[in-house]
C-alpha cells in the first residue's frame, strides 16, 4: 500500500520471472568452534499491470532490499548433526509505486519508500546425510512491533559437495513480513525454490 492506497499482487514463480526487472542474492557464513555468523542479502525489483475496470489499469512496482546478519551458537551436537540458536537483525528497504491510468494517460501516481530494522531470533539444524550430501533447515521470527509488526521465515536446503571447496545447493525458502506505518503498508510473503553455488574460502 502507498499513502493509504492498496493493491493486491499475487504472482507464481513463472509470473515473477516474467515481471522481474532485476534481482540478486548473496549469503556468507563463518564458523569457529561452536559459534557461527552469517550475512544474507537480497535485492528484488518487480513490476506488474492489472485492470480494475473497463479502460482503467493499475501499474504496480515493488523494489525490495533486504539485509540480515546474525550470530549463533551450537546448543546440541550429535555424531553428524548440530542444532544452533541465533539472534540478529534484519534490515528492510521497500519502495512501492502505484499508478492508476487509462490506456492513453495516467490518472494518479503514488510512490513511497520505507526502511526499518527488525530484531531476529531463530534456530538452525544441520545434518550430514552422506559423505557428500548434507541438509540444513532454518526457522526465524522477528519484528515483534519494534520494526515490522511481525516477520518470519524458513528455509530447507540440500547441499551436494562436488570438491573440497565447492558445492551445489537446492532448496526452498519462505519469508513473510507485516508492516504498516503512516499509510505505508506491506503485508506480503515470497516463497519458492532456489539453486545456488557455494565456495569455501578454506
Predicted feature residues:
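Repeated loop/turn-to-beta-strand initiation elements of outer-membrane beta-barrel proteins
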Residues: 34-39, 79, 131-135, 165-168
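Transmembrane beta-barrel strands of outer-membrane/channel proteins
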Residues: 30, 39-43, 85-91, 125, ...
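Residues on the lipid-exposed face of transmembrane beta-strands in outer-membrane beta-barrel proteins
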Residues: 26-32, 69-73, 87-89, 121-127, ...
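Outer-membrane beta-barrel translocator domains and adjoining extracellular loop/strand segments
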Residues: 1-5, 49-55, 96-105, 147-153, ...
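Predominantly the C-terminal beta-signal and adjacent terminal strand-loop region
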Residues: 153-202
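Short glycine/proline- and aromatic-enriched beta-strand/turn motifs that initiate or cap beta-hairpins
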Residues: 1-44, 194-196, 200-202
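Residues that define the transmembrane beta-barrel architecture of outer-membrane proteins
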Residues: 3, 20-24, 61-67, 81, ...
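Extracellular loop and loop/strand-boundary signature of outer-membrane beta-barrel proteins
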Residues: 10-14, 52-60, 104-112, 140-144, ...
Amino acid at each position: 500500500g502507498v499513502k493509504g492506497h492498496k493493491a493486491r499482487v499475487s504472482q507464481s514463480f513463472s509470473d515473477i520471472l516474467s515481471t522481474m526487472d532485476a534481482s540478486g542474492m548473496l549469503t556468507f557464513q563463518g564458523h569457529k568452534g561452536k559459534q557461527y555468523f552469517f550475512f544474507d542479502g537480497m535485492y528484488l525489483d518487480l513490476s506488474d499491470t492489472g485492470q480494475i475496470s473497463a479502460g482503467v489499469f493499475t501499474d504496480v512496482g515493488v523494489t525490495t532490499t533486504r539485509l540480515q546478519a546474525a550470530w549463533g551458537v551450537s546448543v546440541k551436537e550429535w555424531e553428524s548433526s548440530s542444532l544452533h540458536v541465533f539472534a540478529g537483525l534484519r534490515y528492510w528497504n521497500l519502495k512501492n509505486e502505484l499508478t492508476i491510468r487509462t490506456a492513453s494517460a495516467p490518472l494518479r501516481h503514488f510512490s513511497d519508500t520505507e526502511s526499518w530494522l527488525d530484531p531476529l531470533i531463530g534456530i538452525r539444524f544441520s545434518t550430514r546425510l552422506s559423505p557428500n550430501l548434507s541438509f540444513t533447515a532454518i526457522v526465524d521470527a522477528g519484528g515483534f512491533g519494534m520494526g515490522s509488526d511481525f516477520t518470519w521465515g524458513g528455509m530447507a536446503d540440500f547441499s551436494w559437495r562436488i570438491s573440497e571447496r565447492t558445492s551445489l545447493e537446492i532448496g526452498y525458502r519462505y519469508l513473510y513480513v507485516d508492516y504498516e506505518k503512516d499509510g505505508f503498508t506491506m503485508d506480503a510473503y515470497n516463497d519458492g525454490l532456489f539453486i545456488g553455488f557455494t565456495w569455501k574460502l578454506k
